[in-house]
Amino acid sequence: MKETRSKQPDITPDMLLRAYSIGLFPMADSADDPELFWVEPEIRGIIPLDRFHVSRSLAKAIRRRPFDIRFDTAFAEVMEGCAQPAPDRPTTWINDTIRSLYAALHNMGHAHSVEAWEGDALVGGLYGVSLGAAFFGESMFSRRTGASKICLVHLVERLRSKGFQLLDTQFTTEHLKSFGAVDVPKAQYEVLLAKAIASPNLEF
């Protein structure tokens, strides 16, 4: 995937929001590397909110209500879950700098978590950034089958109900494509982003 990278040693929360507003997002090479770099993909992944697809099997699982779904009650714990190695993710880019920046955005009302709980146990979740009428999905994790998928369904329901226009997934995967994620060229993405960012900040 072609992308633009540029090192950025000292990122503030306000700088991070500005970066999102123009199509950039930060990453680190590893959890142990304190440096961040900006990423600007030439091809961007989005999930069109009006074309979100839920498979029959997942819809059936959701109807069984296997988890208690909560919003913004354990943001730091969700980030920690996303930072843990998984079979499809042996390493993580979530370093201490990322944790602290997104915790600050959460305190500012611009970063949010969707959580799947079994009793008192957090078993899956996702987090991302809201700005204007755009939501930028960052990462997700599961400790039970289907937990992150069910969180994504609840995220989309919430975004639709609040009037969000853009769900940015940064890149696409086969997993996300099963929900309707598509690749769009940078120029097309910038048009969608500008429209969503022109909106006042929507309540999540």
UniProtKB/Swiss-Prot annotation:
UniProtKB keywords? Acyltransferase, Cytoplasm, Transferase
Task: Show the InterPro entries listed in the entry.
Answer: Acyl_CoA_acyltransferase (IPR016181), Leu/Phe-tRNA_Trfase (IPR004616), Leu/Phe-tRNA_Trfase_C (IPR042203)
Q: Which Pfam families match?
A: Leu_Phe_trans
Annotated localization: Cytoplasm
Q: What is its EC number?
A: 2.3.2.6
- GO BP annotation list: protein catabolic process
One GO cellular component term noted in the UniProt record for this chain: cytoplasm
The record's section on PANTHER family has: LEUCYL/PHENYLALANYL-TRNA--PROTEIN TRANSFERASE, LEUCYL_PHENYLALANYL-TRNA--PROTEIN TRANSFERASE
Family named by the database record: Belongs to the L/F-transferase family.
User: What's this protein's name?
Assistant: Leucyl/phenylalanyl-tRNA--protein transferase
What's the gene? aat
